[in-house]
Amino acid sequence: APHAWLDIDNAGVTERATSHLLDLGHRHIALLNGPKGMTFALHRDAGYRAAFAARGLSPNPALIHNGAFTDETGFRLAQSLIERTPRPTAFVAGSMMTALGVFRAVRSAGMQLGKEVSMIAHDDVFPYLNADNMVPSMSTTRSSIRAAGTRIGELLGQLLGGKPPGEIHELWPVELVLRESSGPVQD
């Protein structure tokens, strides 16, 4: 039976974020994605690959990783990737928590975010993690969890009112907010 759903455009926004980094000259872009098999992670992976394909390029599979959205996972993955040759010049982080770990790894390697390494993080909607207040400020994607929750409540009302689940499919656009953490590739 068809299901009702509401989702954000994970593929589209990851393609836009990756495209932006490619346009800045980055070619070694690490994707720190969510857990393997999760629908959103599959969509983000597809968006990342589509950005490369649109330019006739292929991403380096060694720079694509899946894992939990934690500071520790971001730190460990980024630390090991930074030691690689060639190292990534940019990261697409699947969450702000992952991005915090990448930020720590970049700093501990003596590099500056937005200069030697760029990053765009997904989801800056956490009230306790303000991307504008970070130094440097974090380039992020943004979608309103609160608005989605409100809309899901409305859609549940429609389902209870007899609307067929197969008629309720909403894909929401996601904003890309560019700040200081994403800069041109350094020679």
Positions of predicted regions on the chain:
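Acidic, Gly/Pro-rich loop/turn segments at junctions of secondary structure
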Residues: A1-P2, S19
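Hinge/beta->alpha junction and helix N-cap segments in small-molecule ligand-binding domains
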Residues: W5-R16, L32-Q79, V92-L100, H122-F126, ...
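Rossmann-fold NAD(P)-dependent oxidoreductase module
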Residues: H20, A51, A105
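Non-catalytic positions within long, well-ordered alpha-helices that form the structural scaffold/packing
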Residues: L22-G25, I82
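Short loop/turn motifs at secondary-structure junctions
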Residues: G25-H28, N60, P86-R87, S137
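Short acidic capping loops at alpha-helix termini that bridge into adjacent secondary structure
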Residues: R27-I29, P59-L63, L113-M119
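Flexible loop/turn connectors
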Residues: Q79-D187
